[in-house]
């Protein structure tokens, strides 16, 4: 009702169009009240911001109004079992198949995994530079909310029993 899911989404896409400073202050205040809720909205904000900054006009028109309304929730997956926080060491890849890409690999965590309907997945491609710090692309993968095999080849494990952040799936 407050429109918080659209905090940084431009008004033309149904959002509030607020600044990064306002975003930081909002997340700080939400975390002060309940850390898990800040994790839920912050991950959504990150995906919305990536789309706003780097998405095509078609992607923005398709995703941002639904994200601003809270109808579509964003999730982000980057870490992999073998590399921890060393993002350059990821091995998941996207291989071009005609006009499409096929994503292959395993991720360690998927914040908002069960509740999200669009996932930003960081993978390597074979296009461009030979540097391990380049050729990384974020793909948007639509999925139904829920756990288990939600799409062929995409399994969202159940909630992890964590010490903190218990409200974040």
What are these regions (language model features)?
Residues 48-54, 76-77, 88, 128:
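Flexible, glycine-rich active-site loops centered on histidine and acidic residues
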Residues 82-90:
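Active-site-adjacent elements of ketosynthase-type condensing enzymes
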Residues 147-169:
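Flexible, small-/acidic-enriched active-site or ligand-binding loops
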Residues 2-71, 112-118:
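Internal helix-loop-helix
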Residues 12-14, 79-83, 106-109, 124-128, ...:
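Short beta-turn/strand-loop junction motif enriched in small, turn-promoting residues
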Residues 92-95:
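A structural signal for short hydrophobic beta-strand segments in well-ordered beta-sheet cores
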Residues 100, 104-153:
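A short core secondary-structure module
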Residues 70-78, 122:
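A short, Trp-centered hydrophobic/proline-enriched beta-strand micro-motif
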């Amino acid at each position: 009702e407050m429109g918080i899911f659209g905090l940084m989404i431009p008004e033309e896409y149904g959002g509030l169009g607020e600044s990064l400073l306002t975003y930081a202050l909002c997340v700080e205040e939400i975390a002060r009240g309940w850390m898990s809720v800040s994790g839920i909205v912050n991950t959504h904000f990150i995906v919305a911001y990536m789309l706003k900054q780097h998405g095509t006009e078609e992607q923005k028109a398709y995703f941002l109004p639904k994200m601003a309304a809270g109808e579509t929730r964003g999730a982000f997956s980057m870490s992999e079992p073998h590399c921890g926080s060393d993002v350059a060491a990821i091995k998941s890849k996207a291989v071009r198949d005609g006009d499409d890409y096929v994503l292959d690999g395993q991720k360690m965590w998927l914040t908002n995994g069960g509740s999200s309907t669009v996932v930003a997945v960081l993978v390597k491609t074979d296009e461009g530079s030979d540097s391990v710090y380049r050729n990384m692309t974020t793909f948007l993968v639509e999925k139904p909310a829920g756990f288990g095999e939600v799409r062929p080849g995409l399994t969202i494990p159940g909630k992890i029993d964590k010490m903190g952040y218990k409200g974040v799936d």
